[in-house]
Amino acid sequence: MDTIIKTQIIDLIHREVIPAIGCTEPIAVALAAAKAAEVLGRKPEKIEVYLSANILKNAMGVGIPGTGMVGLPIAIALGSIIGKSAYGLEVLKDLTSEGLKEGKEMVCKKCIGIDLKENVDKLYIEIISSAGNDRSRVIICHEHTHIIYVEKNGEVLTDLRTANASGEEVCENKDLRLSFSMVYEFAMEMPLDEIRFILETAELNKKAAQASMKGNYGHTVSKTVSGAFGRKFMGDSAYTHMLIMTSAACDARMDGAMIPVMSNSGSGNQGIAATLPVLSFAEDIQCSEEQLIRALMLSHLMVIYIKQSLGRLSALCGCVVAATGASCAITYLMGGNKARISYAIKNMIGNITGMICDGAKPSCAMKVSSGVSTAMLSALMAMEDKVVTSVEGIIDEDVDKSIANLTAIGSKGMEATDRLVLDIMTGKSC
């Protein structure tokens, strides 16, 4: 692998693996609101919000950090009042009790309008803020922090829109298309000092899990597994330790805890699921630091690779992708070679492909746990040279083609499913 490609991959990882506080979809909306307020130069009196279906779906039922509230209005209000766009996905980290009170007052004034925007990218956020005769407009598209358009009082300040900005574009980095072999080679052969930074994912996400265990968040999936019934019927093993640590961080995050996590490809839950099963297993088997670094890099880069063709948001639950990365890493830590790691990927795809995304919410911790369970099973089977074959379902002999089949189903094949899920969610009486 030449130096240019290595540098491109490192840059890609630094761009995709970043800290985030709160579910990334409502936080991205808060980021756009913060930028619109900054450009406006004053507190907005009216805010119009236009969102793609996937952003709307993922922001409806999830807790907003530090508020005890759920949904978009409070996220938009706080972004406009106390948000700082320079913080990116940590836009609300300066929240105070005074700021929260002011945000609640803005929500009560009903000056925030939220509407669905049709025929746009799956990740599309448009904010129009106004006060008096002043008006600002901000658009985020393709990526959670990618501000492509800024306007104030009719003057265009930034315009990165392209001819297909309102269409589907799932991979912004056209100069670097990853493959399984490229991911494996990079993770296994890079000098440790050049990839040691990936340990930051373990440090930050483990802190989130530890903080979660001190409280009661969401459906307390982690405490259920570690509780009396969990210990009695599931035991105490490397497997249950993985479930406990991973679901703990997700429990807290989905419930709106003011706890930062390291995200992957715009998703905190993907960052959690790519990190904590690997870290937990590594701690249980007492592997070396080098093994942990390479395992984490393999997991995170595999997630990035799959998301290149799947897209930021889809009808497919992101835990399928993230758990696939984790399964690769677990197989490696078990002593698996490249062939067995490819078996783990095929086993994952042959098992939980098709799990729908019905928005970000506390029960995501249960889906993450399902992904972790399948990751362990897939790794165990791979180590026994058991693999879903190319005569079965969507699996191809070529592992990259199998991944392409998975992402085609998630990005194209489930579009009608995505629309139906949103219709069901928005049509409920609750």
Swiss-Prot record:
List membrane-spanning regions. Answer: none
Q: Which superkingdom is the protein from?
A: Bacteria
Q: Which GO terms describe its biological process?
A: L-cysteine catabolic process to pyruvate
Q: Do you know which InterPro entries this protein is assigned to?
A: Ser_deHydtase-like_asu, UPF0597
GO MF terms here are:
L-cysteine desulfhydrase activity
Q: What is stated as this protein's family in its record?
A: Belongs to the UPF0597 family.
Q: What is this protein called?
A: UPF0597 protein BDI_1130
Tell me which species this is from. Answer: Parabacteroides distasonis (strain ATCC 8503 / DSM 20701 / CIP 104284 / JCM 5825 / NCTC 11152)
